[in-house]
Each structure stands twice: as structure tokens, then as C-alpha cells.
Amino acid sequence: GKGTIVKRILKSDGKVHLSVSATTRNPREGEEEGVSYYFMSDEQFVKAVGEGGFLEHASVHGHYYGTPKAPVMSQLKAGRDVILEIDVQGAMQVKESYPDGVFIFILPPSVDALRSRIMHRGTESEEDIQVRLGAAQREMEYLEHYDYYVVNDDLEKAVDSVKKIMAAEHWKVT
């Protein structure tokens, strides 16, 4: 899925940076502060929101998630491209504040293919799978608000397409 595409791009291009999200949920086994997430208390998170410290934020399943603004701006200032691997609600918040950002929607080849990928992970219950599929179908309704879409039916092609989009954006005249 999206995460695999992002990992491939990061591995192949040292000038691309992945933003690290903040969350109020507890760390899972193997997750590292500042690498997997920035882990915060509810109070810290709400304070940061009030101070304009996030590009986007949302409450999901009783926990807050968001993209801290300062690290992203620092990477952009250093001349790097920054990837935000976020849901459509987050993307729409970012687009409102930064309409010149480049928004790429990664589409599954089909709902059946998406179901199969989620099931293949073996980490989610049937109920969770149904919730994820419903969310994915709702997210597809936002496709028209994105600049590009890439169908992830072949991983190498999808990675190549995203790289080409990123390159084309650098070559734009206006």
C-alpha cells in the first residue's frame, strides 16, 4: 500500500523526507519516539493545536494524530521534498493552508484487491477490515481534490509514477 511506496521512494532518494506524525496513543512494541511517531499527552497535543503547531490534525478512535509543522518546514527550507502519508481529511486541511502543495492519491486497483491486502497482513479482525474498506471507499470520493492519482496495481510502476510526478513538479515553469 501507501507505506510500501513511501519506503521505496525514501530508500531511493536521499533528498526526500517523510514527516513523522504526532499521536496521543501509547507506543506499540518496537515504535521509537521521533522515528515512528512523536508521542504526546492529550494536554501537550491540544496546546500545540492551539499554538498552530500542526499542519493537520484529527481525532481517530479516541486518540489525536497530527503532522507537526516545524519539522516539515525545516526540511522544506533545507531543499528537501517532504512526504506526508496522511488520510484525505488531513490532506484537505493541508491543502487549505498550503494550496501549492502537491497532492497524490494512491488508489488500490479494486476494493477486492484492497480487502485481500488487508487480510494478507493478518493483523485485523473481520470487523476492522470492514471499517477499513468503508473508510477507503469514502476516501475515494475526495479524488477530485487531488492533483494526481496513482493506481497501485504494480508496486514498481506505482513507485516509478510517484517519482515521475515529483520530478515533473520540480521541472514546472510556473
PLM regions and their residue ranges:
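Walker A/P-loop
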Residues: 2-3
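The feature captures the helix immediately C-terminal to the Walker
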Residues: 6-7
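Post-Walker A helix-loop "phosphate-sensing" segment adjacent to the P-loop in P-loop NTPases
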Residues: 10-20
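ATP-dependent small-molecule kinase phosphotransfer cores
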Residues: 21-82, 89
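Switch/connector loops and helix/strand junctions flanking conserved nucleotide-binding motifs
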Residues: 28-29, 92-94, 112-117, 157-161
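Conserved catalytic network of the ASCE P-loop NTPase/AAA+ motor domain
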Residues: 30, 74-77, 95-99, 141-143
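Conserved phosphate-donor/acceptor-positioning beta-strand/loop module used by diverse small-molecule
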Residues: 82-87, 96-120
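NTP-dependent small-molecule kinase module
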Residues: 100, 116, 120-124, 138-174
